[in-house]
């Protein structure tokens, strides 16, 4: 295998905002001394850019873009300006498909980029070294960082200066980045009370706060050896994105995949503005018993891992830990590492009878978590949980059918069918309430509880439960959007 085959760096963007990201973030980081300038020019490296005619013309006089031509040939692939209603992700996928086809045709090494990326100095040199060592695919973990606070901090520290290459070491980059996680990423912290419903990444902080251990289903494709492919499958780009099942369709063998497991080797940051994408950190697990919170979180990880969204390759890679850190990985990490390994092992095991019994117990004793558990178990067990969760609704319908109760009016559709209330239909919850609130001694507390407003999550469940005669299932597209962000 020739070591002089070219690298094709590939990016899609349009519009003034992303054009600035390209010229002020991505290009300066790639032009640091040990990135693009460190690749041998004899390779004939190219930089494929899918963008509009307006954006292509606008970058011609930019200093960083002119410097790019010294190390890689810019190649423009014109795209028409997207219509306002065009799905952004699919527009990007069309561009990725064109560039991937060009890289396959030329037997090049492909590097998929986004304009809001920043790489540590030496990252591209690492890509070249791994490609020359015969690695067919190199993947790096991809999570979001907060643009509004991290970019000003890089400027304040002197790393990011207008019109200059951005030469920042991996530990300096991680030192800033780990203090500026985006709200989406904050929801992936395992020990947080606002743990994500669809955790595409899961991380744990280590002592002293200068590092995290992360396991992920979301990866950036940093090197793809198109010369190793006899056939190129681009069907993923028809209705999905490059971080879907594109790698699995072309490189299904896990032995072909190299995962960057240490930020010292290669570090990248992807910025997102909170003003463009924001998640409220709702501490719905606060106050839960630790064993309940842990079991629930492991259940959510397992459910996502085993869902149709995940391909076999992502499931195989998921147990691989990745270390992002700003100082040495020292023995103080050991306790966290051992704990993480135990938890990931449990998450990767198939749910047994005990898990199902715990799910049933939580559905009985923690009604607000009941609906979240429905999607994790299939078949009859899911139906049992569903029936118990909405037993008040089912009981009311049965009474209506039997002539024991009047039909619901439109006002009745606002009832809280999901939240429990004192009564024989909710025996366990009622008993717990009696003991906790001492209702027998203070009858007024019953009236006080009845007057309490329902929570926002329960109101949402009400709308789902009553909008079409009963509760509706969560649309699977939510999982797709959680994965693709």
PLM region spans:
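Hydrophobic targeting segments
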Residues: 6-11, 30, 46-49
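Short, well-formed alpha-helical segments that are part of the catalytic scaffolds
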Residues: 17-37
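Short beta-strand/loop segment that forms part of the nucleotide-sugar
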Residues: 41-54
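Active-site-proximal specificity loops/subdomain of glycosyltransferases
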Residues: 52-107
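Short beta-strand-to-loop acidic/aromatic patch adjacent to the donor-nucleotide binding site
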Residues: 106-118
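Conserved catalytic core of nucleotide-sugar-dependent glycosyltransferases
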Residues: 120-266
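Long C-terminal appendages of very large multidomain proteins
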Residues: 219-373
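Membrane-proximal basic amphipathic "stem/tether" segments
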Residues: 340-470, 475-485
């Amino acid at each position: 295998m020739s070591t002089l085959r070219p690298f094709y760096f590939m990016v899609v963007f349009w519009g003034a905002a992303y054009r600035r990201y390209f010229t002020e973030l991505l290009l300066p980081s790639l032009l640091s001394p040990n990135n693009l300038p460190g690749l041998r020019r004899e390779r004939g490296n190219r930089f494929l850019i899918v963008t509009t005619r307006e954006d292509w013309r606008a970058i011609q006089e930019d200093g960083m873009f002119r410097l790019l031509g010294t190390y890689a040939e810019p190649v423009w692939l014109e795209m028409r300006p997207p219509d306002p209603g065009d799905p952004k992700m699919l527009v990007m996928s069309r561009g990725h498909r064109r560039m991937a086809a060009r890289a396959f045709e030329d037997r090049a090494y492909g590097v998929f980029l986004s304009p809001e990326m920043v790489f540590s100095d030496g990252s591209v040199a690492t890509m070249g070294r791994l490609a020359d060592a015969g690695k067919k695919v190199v993947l790096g973990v991809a999570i979001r960082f907060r643009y509004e606070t991290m970019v000003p901090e890089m400027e304040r520290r002197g790393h990011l200066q207008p019109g200059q290459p951005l030469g920042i070491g991996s530990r300096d980059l991680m030192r800033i980045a780990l203090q500026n996680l985006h709200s989406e990423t904050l929801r992936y912290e395992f020990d947080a009370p606002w743990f994500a419903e669809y955790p595409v990444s899961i991380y744990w902080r280590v002592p002293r706060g200068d590092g995290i251990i992360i396991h992920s289903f979301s990866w950036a494709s940093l090197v793809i050896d198109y010369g190793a492919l006899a056939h190129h499958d681009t069907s993923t780009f028809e209705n999905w994105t490059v971080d879907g099942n594109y790698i699995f369709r072309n490189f299904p063998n896990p032995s072909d995949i190299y995962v960057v497991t240490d930020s010292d080797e290669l570090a990248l940051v992807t910025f997102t503005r909170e003003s463009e994408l924001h998640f409220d950190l709702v501490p719905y697990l606060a106050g839960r018993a630790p064993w309940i919170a842990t079991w629930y979180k492991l259940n959510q990880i397992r459910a996502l891992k085993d869902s149709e969204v995940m391909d076999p390759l992502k499931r195989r890679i998921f147990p691989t830990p990745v270390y992002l850190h700003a100082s040495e990985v020292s023995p103080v990490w050991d306790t966290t590492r051992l704990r993480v390994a135990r938890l990931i092992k449990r998450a990767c095991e198939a749910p047994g009878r005990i898990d199902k019994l715990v799910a049933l117990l939580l559905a009985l004793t923690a009604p607000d978590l009941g609906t979240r558990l429905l999607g994790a178990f299939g078949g009859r067990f899911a139906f049992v949980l569903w029936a118990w969760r909405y037993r008040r609704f089912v009981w009311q319908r049965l009474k209506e059918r039997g002539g024991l109760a009047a039909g619901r009016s439109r006002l009745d559709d606002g009832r809280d069918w999901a939240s429990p209330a004192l009564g024989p239909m909710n025996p366990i919850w009622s008993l717990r309430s009696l003991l906790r609130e001492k209702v027998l001694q203070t009858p007024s507390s019953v009236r006080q509880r009845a007057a309490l407003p329902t929570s926002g999550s329960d109101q949402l469940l009400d709308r789902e439960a009553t909008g079409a005669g009963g509760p509706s299932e969560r649309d699977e597209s939510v999982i797709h959007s959680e994965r693709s962000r």
